[in-house]
Amino acid sequence: VGFKAGVKEYKLTYYTPEYETKDTDILAAFRVTPQPGVPPEEAGAAVAAESSTGTWTTVWTDGLTSLDRYKGRCYNIEPVLGETDQYICYVAYPLDLFEEGSVTNMFTSIVGNVFGFKALRALRLEDLRIPPAYIKTFQGPPHGIQVERDELNKYGRPLLGCTIKPKLGLSAKNYGRACYECLRGGLDFTKDDENVNSQPFMRWRDRFLFCAEAIYKAQAETGEIKGHYLNATAGTCEEMIKRAVFARELGVPIVMHDYLTGGFTANTSLAHYCRDNGLLLHIHRAMHAVIDRQKNHGMHFRVLAKALRLSGGDHIHSGTVVGKLEGERDITLGFVDLLRDDFIEKDRSRGIYFTQDWVSLPGVIPVASGGIHVWHMPALTEIFGDDSVLQFGGGTLGHPWGNAPGAVANRVALEACVQARNEGRDLAAEGNEIIREPSKWSPELAAACEVWKEIKFEFKAVDTLD
C-alpha cells in the first residue's frame, strides 16, 4: 500500500458514531468548546486523536501498527443545553493504551497535550468510566471504610476531626498540646494542615513525636482510639516514605498526603506502604481548584476523586455543601457516592455521565471541612451520613473557652444529631431545635451556639449543573 503523506481531517479517522463501546474501554466525557468555525465532529475527533494515537499529520509509521486496534474514538456528541457552541463529546479508549496500575499514565494520555490544543477554545474532562478490567490492576485504598471502623472501634456515626490552627507558626510542643486538648474533648482525629510539612519553626520529627504523645495521653484518658493525620508529604518520594516509616514506628494509626501537589506516583507508593504496614491514609486535595473550578476548562473533581480511589486513600476532602468552600449539593453527593459505593448508576442530574462498577475496590470516606460549625451539624449529618469525617478547624479552636470545650461542643452536637436521626426526626426541618435542646445542659455547646449563630457563607457555586 502506498503511503499518502499530508494533513488529513481528524474526523475521517477518529469520529466513529457507529462504534459500539466495549466493556473493557475507558470512556471519557469531555466538555468541548471549539474555536469559531471548527465543527463539533472535528473538535471531538481531534480530542480523541490527540489523547490517543494521532498527531497533526499522517506518518509513515502508521502503516506498522493497527490504528483500528489502538485509536481513541469519538463515538457520540451532544450539544450542551443553554450554551451556544459547546458540546459533550464522548470518547472511547482501548484498554491497551494504558499501563496497568498507573493513574499517572492514564492521565498523561487522557488529559495530557490535548488540553493545549489550538483548535479548541476550552476543554474539560467531566467524567471517566473506568472498566473493571482496569480497576483490577490497582490496589486502591489501603484499607477502606469497614476496616477503618473496625480498627478505630467506632460505629453508627460520622467521625469528628479538627485541623490545628494557626496552620503555620506553632512550635512542635504547642502544636502537640493543641492536638491533645481537642482529642481529650471528644474528637476522633486532629489534622496537620496541608501546608505543614517540615518548616524551620517545626521540623517533622519533632511534630510527630509530640502529636504521638498527645494521642496516647488522650486515649488513656478517654478510653477511645484517637488519631492525628501526620502529614508525610515531602519534597521527594524517599523522604515521604521515611516519614511514614517513622509514624509507623511510633504506633500511630494514620498518616496524610497532599495527593495533587505530591503527585499520583508518590501517592500510589505511599498507599502501598500504608496497606503493607497497617496505616490509614488521609488525603488532602490541595491544588484541586486550580484544575476543577472553571466550568468549561480543566477537569471535574469527580474525575480526580475516581483517580484517588484507584491510586489509594482512606479519606479525601470533598467539600461541605454548607461551609466556605465551593460545592453544589447534588454534584457533591454524586462524587461522594462515587467514593463510597461499589456500584453507581449513570445519573446526569448529579453530573454522573457513566455507570461505574468498582468491583469491590474498597471505598473512601469523604471529609467535609472548611467553614463549618455546630449549627451546620444537622445538615452535615443528613447530607453525608455515617461514613464521613466532619472536620471543624475554626469551629473547634475558635470556641471562646478554648480547644477542649470546642471539641466537647462538637461532640455533643453530633451525638444529638445522630440520636435525633435515629429517632426518626427530620434533621433538615428541626435542625436548630435539635442543637438547642442539648445546649441547655451543655454549657460548652451553648457558648459555641452563641458565637456562631449568624455566620453564613452564601455565594452561588461557580461550577453548577447545566
From Swiss-Prot:
Localisation per UniProt entry: Plastid, Chloroplast
One of the Pfam families matching this protein, by short name: RuBisCO_large_N
Post-translational modification: The disulfide bond which can form in the large chain dimeric partners within the hexadecamer appears to be associated with oxidative stress and protein turnover.
Residue(s) at site: Transition state stabilizer: 324
GO cellular component: chloroplast
UniProt entry tagged with the keyword Plastid: yes
Example of a GO biological process term: photorespiration
Molecular functions per Gene Ontology: magnesium ion binding; monooxygenase activity; ribulose-bisphosphate carboxylase activity
Cofactor: Mg(2+)
N6-carboxylysine, modified sites: 191
Residues engaged in binding substrate: 113, 163, 167, 285, 317, 369
Presence of keyword Plastid: yes
EC id: 4.1.1.39
Residues that bear N6,N6,N6-trimethyllysine: 4
Record: active site: 165 (proton acceptor), 284 (proton acceptor)
Cofactor binding note from Swiss-Prot or TrEMBL: Binds 1 Mg(2+) ion per subunit.
Primary enzyme class: lyase
Residue sites binding Mg(2+) per the record: 191, 193-194
Keywords: Calvin cycle, Carbon dioxide fixation, Chloroplast, Disulfide bond, Lyase, Magnesium, Metal-binding, Methylation, Monooxygenase, Oxidoreductase, Photorespiration, Photosynthesis, Plastid
InterPro entries for the chain: RuBisCO, RuBisCo_large_chain_AS, RuBisCO_lsu_C, RuBisCO_lsu_C_sf, RuBisCO_lsu_fd_N, RuBisCO_lsu_N_sf, RuBisCO_lsuI
Reactions it catalyzes: 2 (2R)-3-phosphoglycerate + 2 H(+) = D-ribulose 1,5-bisphosphate + CO2 + H2O; D-ribulose 1,5-bisphosphate + O2 = 2-phosphoglycolate + (2R)-3-phosphoglycerate + 2 H(+)
Record's function text: RuBisCO catalyzes two reactions: the carboxylation of D-ribulose 1,5-bisphosphate, the primary event in carbon dioxide fixation, as well as the oxidative fragmentation of the pentose substrate in the photorespiration process. Both reactions occur simultaneously and in competition at the same active site.
UniProt subunit comment: Heterohexadecamer of 8 large chains and 8 small chains; disulfide-linked. The disulfide link is formed within the large subunit homodimers.
Annotated NCBIfam families: PRK04208.1 (NF003252)
PANTHER family cross-referenced by the UniProt entry: RIBULOSE BISPHOSPHATE CARBOXYLASE (PTHR42704), RIBULOSE BISPHOSPHATE CARBOXYLASE LARGE CHAIN (PTHR42704:SF15)
Name by which UniProt lists this protein: Ribulose bisphosphate carboxylase large chain
Gene: rbcL
